[in-house]
């Protein structure tokens, strides 16, 4: 038994950079995951990457995002995974980034992977969280490093 997939699942380490994938999809879980990863890797920079789940949930919990990501070196926010919702056209990942210190909105997965190729350093930990397609992003980052 090696653990449960998508729950702080360490996918691998390439060039000294560790990529972790998790199913978390709300600020309480983001914060708990960052605390756990920081406990395991106290001296390493931790990058948090989220694929927000639905439009309504992050909009309703927007005020919780700054505290949730307090332990992150930087936060990368992708486009929102709509799931069962229709895009209302008045809320995006850019709104989350604007409300979150040290956050950057990079909507496309391929651009996020390229960003890490250029900015991640040996010793860094990249924690990717979301319940939509973020598992694909985790693997894309790992293969791009």
Label the predicted regions.
Residues 1-145:
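ATP-dependent carboxylate-amine ligase
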């Amino acid at each position: 038994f090696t653990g449960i997939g998508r729950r702080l699942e360490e996918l691998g380490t390439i060039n000294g950079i560790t990529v972790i994938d998790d199913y978390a999809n709300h600020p309480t879980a983001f914060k708990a995951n960052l605390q756990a990863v920081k406990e395991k890797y106290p001296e390493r920079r931790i990058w948090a990457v989220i694929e927000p789940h639905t439009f309504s949930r992050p909009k309703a919990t927007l005020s919780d995002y700054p505290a949730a990501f307090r332990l992150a070196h930087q936060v990368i926010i992708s486009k929102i995974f709509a799931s069962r919702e229709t895009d209302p056209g008045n809320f995006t990942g850019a709104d989350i980034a604007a409300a979150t210190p040290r956050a950057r909105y990079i909507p496309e997965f391929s651009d996020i992977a390229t960003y890490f190729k250029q900015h991640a350093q040996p010793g860094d930990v990249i924690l990717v969280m979301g319940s939509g397609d973020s598992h694909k992003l985790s693997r894309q980052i790992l293969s791009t490093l």
